A protein has these predicted regions:
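Mature soluble binding/inhibitory domains
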Residues: 1-181
């Protein structure tokens, strides 16, 4: 079933900034205003560092077509005919860590946002696949922030698979609680 591109709305909840202090470190600062979305107007500042789980890619800006790229698929991907969802791929060595942002199943246009993650490994066929996980944790403004405990906060909800045709095109398939997409 195609994703209904008109089934979402945006609410500006506040500013966000990232300041880098080097190639692998920085500071993330954001505020969520008290506008009925759960924010209380507090400002949160977090120290961030690059998450390295393989050989880091060498990235260079190019204005040219990426269709020839077959070695690194790190990017923010979406289907332009299904605006409202997307997937971020962080690609290092033979692993792609994916963060899928979409909406919970339901009827109508008021479904809650849903974030799922997958750590996918490259198979001998060139396909990347792995388990799809839903995590829960501390609120964005929790002080102190309680780190994620995978044994408590992570639930396997399905599987994810991505096969790239080239650097611009791929096919993503996944299932959530038995429902295939």
């Amino acid at each position: 079933t195609p994703f209904p591109g008109n089934a979402f709305s945006f609410v500006d909840v506040g500013p966000l900034s990232v300041t880098f202090s080097g190639d692998s470190a920085g500071t993330l600062t954001y505020s969520v205003q008290g506008d009925g979305t759960g924010g209380n107007g507090s400002t949160v500042t977090k120290t961030i560092s690059r998450q390295a789980f393989g050989t880091l890619p060498v990235c260079e800006f190019t204005g040219s077509d990426r269709s020839f790229a077959t070695q690194n698929f790190q990017d923010l991907w979406w289907n332009p005919t299904e605006s409202g969802w997307g997937i971020n791929f962080t690609h290092q060595s033979n692993t792609i860590f994916a963060t899928l942002f979409t909406f919970e199943p339901g009827v109508g246009n008021n479904n809650k946002g849903l974030w799922l993650t997958a750590s996918m490994t490259r198979q001998s066929t060139g396909v990347y696949s792995g388990q799809l996980v839903k995590v829960t944790g501390s609120a964005f403004d929790a002080v102190p922030f309680v780190p994620l405990n995978p044994a408590v906060n992570a639930t396997i909800v399905g599987n994810m698979r991505v096969e790239f045709t080239d650097g611009n095109t791929g096919t993503l398939t996944y299932d959530v609680n038995g429902q295939s997409v």
